[in-house]
Amino acid sequence: MTLIKNISGFRGTIGGNSLENLTPVDIVTSISAFSRLIKESNPNSSGLTVVTGRDGRKSGKMIHSIVNSTFNSMGINVIDAGLSTTPTLCWGVLNNDSVGGLMITASHNPEEYNGLKFFNSDGEFLSKEDVFKLIEYSESKNYVFSSNGYLGSIRKYEKLIDDHVDAILNLKILPVNEIKDLNLSVSVDAINSGGSIAIPKLLYRLNVKYNIINSEIKGVFNHMPEPLAENLTDLSKSIQVNN
């Protein structure tokens, strides 16, 4: 099938022919195009940095390696958050002096899909105008790679989720102590992805009892990620039994 390209990112099935699926070739051209867009938006800046992360899909590590290397080849530094969540990555962009972010995920698509979500310096989706430019640049393949002395670097930031949880708990609008006193109990279906890490950290800090199902990050979803009734039977049973 043809790659899907819109304001929420580029996505497709893994493997096959370029331009028809999400292949290493398509990943390189997409990240190179995004790098060009970033440089044009910051013409007088040096040492530009982006934050990258991925969900729990099996293809995520492979794609992440290509993404980071391509950014570096375009002279852009990378803060690598590793396995993460999209809200955490967006928060990381805002709080690490970054000019953009890239999340490797296909959201609610089946596990044979993966995708690239592009974010601006505010941790938000690109504007319609920038998406049009991104598509144009990725198709024209008109970008200049950096020479040896100007390659970017990679810094691992595996505590980004922890720092994001700290920031959430410090929000003035969140009545943390009141929540702790409620003795709440919840069930969570993490579908073997990044939520398996992030959600328990937040719930524990809020003194919320929780039961996590499908919490093993193994690159395979236990069911389709789209939250339809037929995909929520395990969660419904967990709520009845544990809450």
Question: Where are the regions a protein language model picked out?
Answer:
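Residues at secondary-structure transition points
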Residues: 15-18, 59, 107, 121, ...
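Short, flexible coil/turn micro-motifs enriched in small/turn-prone residues
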Residues: 3-7, 48, 77, 110, ...
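Short, flexible micro-motifs
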Residues: 11-15, 56, 85, 104, ...
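Short, glycine-/Ser/Thr-/acidic-enriched flexible segments
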Residues: 10, 57, 107-109, 123-124, ...
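N-terminal small/polar loop signature for handling phosphorylated ligands or for N-terminal nucleophile
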Residues: 36, 43, 49-113, 201-243
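Gly/Ser/Thr-enriched, mixed-charge loops and adjacent short helices
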Residues: 13, 114-243
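An N-terminal, well-structured beta->alpha segment
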Residues: 1-69, 73-74, 150-186
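Helix N-cap and loop-to-helix transition residues
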Residues: 6, 23, 85, 126-127
